[in-house]
Amino acid sequence: MTSKTLYQKIYDSHVVYEDKNGESILYIDLHLLHEVTSPQAFDALRSKKRKVRQSKKTFATMDHNVSTKIQSISASGSMAKKQMEQLIKNCRDFNIPLYDINNPNQGIVHVIAPEKGMTLPGMTIVCGDSHTSTHGAFGALAFGIGTSEVEHVLATQTLKQKRFKNMKVEIIGKIPKFVTAKDIILFIIGQLGSSSGTGYVIEFCGDVIKNISMEERMTICNMAIEMGAKSGLIAPDEITYKYLKDKIYSPSGLFWEKSLDYWKFLKSDKNAHFDKCITLDISNLAPQITWGTNPDQVISIDEKIPDYNNINSLLKKESAKSACEYMGLKSNTYLTNISIDRVFIGSCTNARIEDLRAASKILKNRKIAKHVKAIVVPGSGSVKRKAEQEGLDKIFIDSGFEWRLPGCSMCLGMNKDRLNFGERCASTSNRNFEGRQGRGGRTH
């Protein structure tokens, strides 16, 4: 029997048809929707008089455009309101479950699906959103798709795909104090580059991965896309099973036992072939922070911004120079000496309960600078309630933060939470692109 990687096992088990050129029709187990990338797909279904093939394997939420100040679809502008109204109508017409703003469990799509047990090992999962790779933390093959592909999955519950190469990234060493999963994935991206994963599905493994929580694993897989990868994967284990036990959509009873038997098969075989293998030791890692305008322009908190004149690659040199100009920074200076205007704690990368606990622990009995505007946006209604039960909201408010409603918020400039021109923000989100948090905004 041929040895296989985790990616190959999941892919092969979902092939409906494969032609001689290696292009496949893959069955999709779970299709997640939100208000921004789905309207045109539903319009196309109506124009062709087609139905949704598997409405029970499709779930929708409002997250990108929602206001985190007021529980109203009118609070983020006319375009946002129109998109949310359209999502309500589409889900009603096609019988799709919707977590709208009046649902107590509404939140970011990549937060609510795992916390409700929709995301399970061995699944194929798609969504019209780049950071669908988050779900790979459960040993699911998960990736973002475009609007035309959203239509295709709605209509057929399948998707045309090709096989990607497979990369193994092994993380070893003891996690230093104050280093988080976000630091680890930023370090990986910084070491390998923002295009290092192009054409690959990446499996993260090693002692470090084995010993971190599911929420930390989600952070790592969430940002696999920032390496250019199709998806990120982590093999399921006892930590995964414990997290999924008794979730609303998780299997139960005899089905749970049968699922466990299958999930234990979901790991790369000992002699499985990877197209590329990389090992990184994080024993001496310090907290990481980006200085530029893409995630691989990253340094340790105690390092200086690199001198772009010393960069050999002309392309990287010009990119670094441009980034410094946009960010209003100079080479050979410390970011710890740079003043910030805003702080954002949230996004599908870092808005879960463990993230809020970690941040509140630092903020307890402290006050933020008077000139800094700071917000905390829980990833879901469930996370918000849990945090409030633990009194975390009071810690944030007492320190000077605003405690908001769930949503994507300041991760992207699609709602009212955005930077003003020239403002500098320390953000727990996943992208530091130019204008990502608002025109002229500077994101770290």
Curated annotation (Swiss-Prot):
GO BP terms, alphabetized: L-leucine biosynthetic process
CDD domains (UniProt xref): IPMI
Reported impact of L254F: In strain: UT.002
Cofactor binding remark: Binds 1 [4Fe-4S] cluster per subunit.
Pfam families linked to this entry: Aconitase
UniProt-listed HAMAP family: LeuC_type1 (MF_01026)
PANTHER family hit by this protein: 3-ISOPROPYLMALATE DEHYDRATASE (PTHR43822:SF9), HOMOACONITASE, MITOCHONDRIAL-RELATED (PTHR43822)
The protein's name: 3-isopropylmalate dehydratase large subunit
Organism (species): Buchnera aphidicola subsp. Uroleucon ambrosiae
